[in-house]
């Protein structure tokens, strides 16, 4: 006789707060040998960066109809896109950039004044306690 298996429980359904992280939108790092580094990652790990990064698609767990992409790319060591002292930067996909920035401001998080609007979405940047720059991306509506 088998012992009964516990039922998998799900957390109670609650109203989700807007301005939350949905997933990782990008991993960016610097290299003094950008082209060779791209070739190495393509050859050995299959991350083929053809100029705009390797695109790694995924779907939301709670809404599989919503597809996103995580971008992996190598920047030149001289890039000003993120601070010289920072060898990498993580981009997080968010559901509501304005709501998140409003909440982070109230919580005293350091927020970069720069904003960027592109055809593929809106961007903002914040800093963690160690001063690491973090990119926030709200994708454009399809």
Regions found by a protein language model. Give the residues of each.
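A short, acidic/glycine-rich surface segment
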Residues: 11-12, 75-78
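Short, acidic/polar N-cap/turn motifs at the starts of alpha helices
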Residues: 53-55, 89, 114, 123
């Amino acid at each position: 006789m088998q012992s009964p298996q516990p039922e998998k429980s799900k957390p109670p359904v609650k109203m989700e707060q807007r301005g939350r992280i949905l997933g990782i939108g990008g991993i960016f790092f610097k290299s003094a040998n950008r082209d060779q580094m791209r070739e190495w990652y393509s050859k050995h790990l299959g991350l083929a960066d053809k100029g705009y990064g390797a695109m790694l698609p995924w779907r939301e767990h709670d809404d599989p109809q919503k597809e996103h992409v995580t971008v992996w790319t190598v920047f030149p060591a001289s890039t000003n896109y993120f601070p010289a002292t920072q060898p990498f930067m993580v981009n997080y996909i968010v559901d509501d950039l304005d709501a998140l920035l409003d909440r982070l401001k109230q919580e005293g998080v350091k927020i970069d004044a720069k904003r960027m609007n592109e055809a593929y979405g809106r961007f903002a940047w914040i800093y963690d306690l160690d001063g690491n720059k973090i990119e926030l991306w709200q994708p454009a509506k399809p």
